């Protein structure tokens, strides 16, 4: 199996086994962190007890196609992605749960943000720009649900502008507009107006974005039938789907527990988003 979609990268069976085992290790550790973290919050020892349980496998798969220079605009269930990228440890997650004020231990915000709000730096300690093309970038998460969508549009549009325009001094920000912005959102938040506005903007502007929707069949305690037309956001958005004679958005569905299908789906999504600037929505069915 190839891990990269843009170029066919042949790997040995031994190397492939190592990747699969490492993914399993990350998924297992992240799930245990979620279980123990929720316990600490319910016992009153920590703050904010929403973690990434149930979304682990799609996120480790996503990490294989998330390249240096790319950006994430997501929310508080994305811990597994950062763990898979070696940007977050179990110890650091608990430092955030306990609100540790020292950035040496809680390096995301030094306890200033809610737990589960992730970021990477864009400037160094001397206020100089960091080379964003040589790192995996995570824009600082914010609390209002679906608010990540408008930021996703801006980040994706930046890549398009860099590809279509020669901009002096852009070496630390883009490699000819080959960056993808990766969005994550829960199925309940897709019922919000800001989501539909952002999706429409992605389709109109044709920006390089891949939006993963985690579909648990429920949004908190509300079933899909009570907040989503046709009980499926991919069906509700069918009119946005790209066709042979009209640009739009590629809309895909995949079972969130199917490792092989997830690999194929994200490989295809990354290829068309990165190379052709076609926006993609992936509905990951966690509950089936």
Language model regions located:
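Conserved phosphate-handling catalytic cores of large alpha/beta enzymes
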Residues: 224-228, 232-236, 246-278
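Cofactor-/ligand-binding subdomain signature composed of acidic, glycine-rich
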Residues: 1-47, 68, 76-78
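Generic recognition of stable, solvent-exposed alpha-helical segments in well-folded globular domains
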Residues: 22, 28, 32, 57, ...
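Conserved small/polar residues in nucleotide/adenosyl-binding loops
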Residues: 286-288
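Cofactor-binding active-site loop characterized by glycine-rich and histidine/acidic residues
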Residues: 45-207, 212, 219, 223-241, ...
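Intrinsically disordered or highly flexible coil/loop and linker segments, enriched in small
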Residues: 33-37, 71, 103, 107, ...
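Active-site-proximal beta-strand/loop segments in catalytic clefts of secreted hydrolases
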Residues: 213-215, 256
């Amino acid at each position: 199996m190839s891990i990269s979609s843009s170029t066919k990268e042949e790997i040995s069976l031994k190397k492939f086994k190592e990747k699969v085992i490492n993914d399993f290790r990350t998924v297992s550790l992240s799930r245990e962190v979620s279980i123990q973290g929720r316990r600490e919050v319910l016992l009153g020892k920590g703050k904010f007890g929403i973690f990434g349980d149930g979304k682990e496998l799609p996120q480790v798969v996503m990490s294989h196609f998330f390249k240096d220079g790319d950006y994430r605009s997501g929310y508080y269930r994305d811990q597994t992605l950062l763990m898979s990228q070696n940007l977050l440890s179990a110890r650091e997650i608990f430092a955030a749960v306990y609100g540790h004020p020292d950035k040496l231990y809680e390096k995301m915000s030094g306890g200033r943000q809610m737990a589960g709000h992730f970021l990477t730096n864009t400037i160094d300690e001397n206020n100089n720009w960091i080379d964003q093309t040589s790192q995996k970038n995570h824009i600082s998460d914010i609390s209002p649900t679906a608010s990540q969508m408008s930021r996703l549009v801006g980040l994706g549009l930046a890549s398009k502008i860099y590809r279509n325009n020669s901009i002096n001094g852009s070496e630390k920000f883009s490699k000819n507009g080959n960056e993808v912005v990766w969005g994550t959102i829960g199925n309940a938040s897709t019922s919000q107006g800001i989501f539909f506005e952002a999706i429409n903007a992605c389709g109109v502007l044709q920006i390089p974005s891949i939006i993963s929707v985690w579909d648990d069949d429920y949004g908190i305690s509300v079933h899909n039938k009570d907040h989503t037309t046709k009980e499926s956001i991919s069906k509700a958005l069918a009119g946005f789907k790209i066709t042979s004679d009209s640009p739009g958005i590629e809309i895909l569905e995949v079972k969130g527990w199917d490792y092989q299908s997830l690999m194929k789906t994200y490989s295809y999504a990354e290829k068309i988003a990165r190379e052709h600037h076609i926006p993609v929505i992936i509905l990951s069915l966690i509950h089936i």
